[in-house]
Amino acid sequence: NWAVDCVADYASEKTGMQISVGRVNLEFPLDLGVEDFKMIKPNDSLPQVRDTVADVEKLVVSVQLMPLLSRQVEIDQLELRGVNMNTTDFIHEARVKGTVGLLSLSSHGIDWGKQTIIVDDALLSDANVSVELSDTVPPDTTKTPTYWKIHVEQLNVDRTRAVVHMPGDTLQVDAYLGKAGVREGTFDLYKNLYRVDNFELADGRIAYDNKFMTRSRDIIDPNHILLSEVNLGIDSLSYAMETSELKLVMRHCALKERGGLQIADIKGPLSMDSLKLKMPQLLLKTPDSWLKAAVDMDLNAFSDSCPGRLSLRANASLGKRDLMRFMSGMPAPFRRQWPDK
């Protein structure tokens, strides 16, 4: 631990930050354990104030030594517990801060020469993160290409919340993942191609809030959306950034909206790019209604000038309760006399 203190002092001197380590020890069998790691820097606006960049209760790491000689990294275990973080001014585009209960991963296949990463298993749990985007950063025209390819065999996220604040805090997106999982994900950072074989979400919650718009009394307020009890299953999810092409197969989707609308299930394939949306086998169910449809729509179908085409074939059975949610402005006698079936 004396040597660790010397290294921490040297790092503090070189970085201009206060870096300290409470204790270093060996974890069974031969893993390195670090406790009470702290990194503190002066505030970017108030030098007399200090910001905690990182405060880690415990870090455990096990890395194989021999592969390092051939520029490969084999991580048997990497585990962080009790993390408090704040990126302060390190990332100009955004400030990320929050807490992480547990972050762990194992990775056997990090190759610096080939620029590939294989993550065998990763877990993030009990995290609460806030992302504040900045509107004062000019675009970076000096970025160098990133050729890394990342393959994730299994990623689980439990009891985690993330809040994104748009510049000026005009818009806010709040997402909670009760239990989420990704299987067989491939991410090509150079070609901007992303693919996930399977995505599952249980007990999710999503809120979208436009703070500059007053709340509407409509069944669904597009400026203030709150979805709860979100359960989702997606197969064959892919996205190509260059063409804006999105493809997926919705296996199941259920949710509740704050205004009373409840979706019991949505399923079917979907494809979308910058010009067109296709849902050839859409099935939508609520507790009282169902809809089967085939949709082929140009995204400019409702444009005032030169509108595109819309093709829709549908069969449906609509229950009274669902219809009445969209007829709240109709006279009460009219709504009462509407037949139940």
Model-derived regions: residue spans:
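Short, surface-exposed beta-strand/loop "edge" segments at domain boundaries and coil↔beta transitions
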Residues: 163-165, 171, 202-210, 255-257, ...
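Flexible beta-edge/linker motif
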Residues: 22-134, 145-167, 176, 181-209, ...
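Strand-loop-strand
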Residues: 274-292, 296-309, 324-341
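Short beta-strand segments that buttress and anchor functional surface loops
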Residues: 36-39, 251-255, 280-286
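N-terminal type II signal-anchor transmembrane helix
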Residues: 1-16, 44-46
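Short, surface-exposed beta-strand-loop junctions and turns on beta-sheet-rich folds
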Residues: 40-41, 138, 170-171, 214-215, ...
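Beta-propeller and related beta-repeat scaffolds in trafficking/envelope systems
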Residues: 51, 80, 93-98, 103, ...
